């Protein structure tokens, strides 16, 4: 596997499309819209697919199809393990699972999703050696934890990033990060959430021993219960984000938009 240091996860996806010359791809409805925008921009035909309530894909795909599958909230490594044995052209979006093993023909993560002092950057693992004429990102910044407004501003900046190699600032911050410490901290916080919320969580999932989730995903019994929990968390200084854009209520996945509370490890 080649490791490529790029400036964002979405540009990792762009790199993959270019590297393999992908013209058609399967993408789930339940996913950040930036990924479909990348595919559209690169001229890919997109076939959208549904997922079940355990996050596994509903359909059976053509054997040699290119498939983008997200490791949702970092709790879906067992599903990834099954898919990679069936589909030779699986692409794994590990934006929510930095510590996951490389899988499929390519997989990528997102530094800023896991390390609050890092603003951008992503690692791409790809089984094809290619050479693109791209520049190194020159973005520089002072590392600090961002408030909500600054996070939104940074998101808008990332939306407009050209595909470039990771900036020196981001690379240095990443290399100076104690990955073992961050891993242990996340697992500890996740376990604390488990003790409090597992009995009432409508999501049924079992982690692999090495899984390090992005957050604690809590599926409330009703939309009203979810709203109450979000309000309570906000009153305690915890910002909760919706994942992702609203989708039609007739879709299975709409339950996640309406009732899933992604509790951050802050």
Task: Identify the residue ranges that each predicted region occupies.
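PLP-dependent aminotransferase-like
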Residues: 2-3, 11-85, 89
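Hydrophobic transmembrane helix bundles of membrane-integrated enzymes that assemble
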Residues: 10, 60-61, 77, 81, ...
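Generic structural signal for small/hydrophobic residues in well-ordered secondary structure
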Residues: 12, 25, 71, 93, ...
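Short, polar loop motifs at secondary-structure junctions
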Residues: 30-34, 74-75, 93-101, 129, ...
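PLP-dependent aminotransferase class I/II
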Residues: 31, 50-51, 68, 134-266
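Short loop/helix-cap segments at secondary-structure boundaries that form the rim of catalytic
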Residues: 36-41, 58-63, 79-86, 98-105, ...
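Active-site PLP-lysine loop of aminotransferase-like
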Residues: 73, 108-120, 128-141, 266
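Conserved active-site segment immediately N-terminal to the catalytic lysine
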Residues: 89-125
């Amino acid at each position: 596997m080649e490791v490529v240091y790029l400036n964002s996860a979405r540009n990792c996806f762009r790199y993959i499309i270019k590297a393999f010359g992908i013209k058609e791809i399967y993408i789930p409805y339940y996913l950040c819209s930036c990924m479909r925008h990348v595919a559209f921009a690169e001229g890919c035909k997109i076939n959208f697919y549904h997922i079940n309530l355990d996050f596994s894909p509903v359909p059976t795909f053509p054997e040699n199809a290119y498939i983008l599958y997200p490791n949702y909230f970092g709790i879906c490594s067992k599903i990834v393990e099954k898919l990679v044995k069936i589909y030779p052209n699986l692409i794994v979006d590990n934006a929510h699972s930095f510590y996951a093993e490389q899988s499929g023909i390519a997989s990528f993560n997102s530094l800023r999703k896991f390390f609050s002092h890092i603003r951008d950057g992503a690692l791409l693992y790809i089984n094809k050696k290619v050479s693109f004429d791209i520049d190194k990102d020159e973005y520089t910044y002072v590392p600090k934890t961002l408030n909500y407004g600054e996070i939104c501003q940074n998101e808008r900046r990332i939306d407009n990033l050209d595909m470039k190699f990771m900036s020196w600032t981001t690379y240095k911050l990443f290399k100076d990060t104690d990955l073992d410490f961050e891993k242990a901290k996340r697992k500890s916080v996740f376990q604390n959430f488990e003790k409090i919320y597992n009995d009432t969580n409508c999501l049924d999932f079992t982690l692999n021993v090495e899984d390090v989730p992005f957050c604690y995903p809590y599926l409330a019994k009703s939309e009203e219960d979810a709203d109450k929990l979000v309000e309570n968390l906000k009153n305690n200084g915890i910002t909760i984000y919706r994942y992702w854009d609203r989708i039609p209520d007739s879709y299975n996945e709409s339950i996640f938009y309406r009732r899933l509370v992604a509790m951050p490890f802050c």
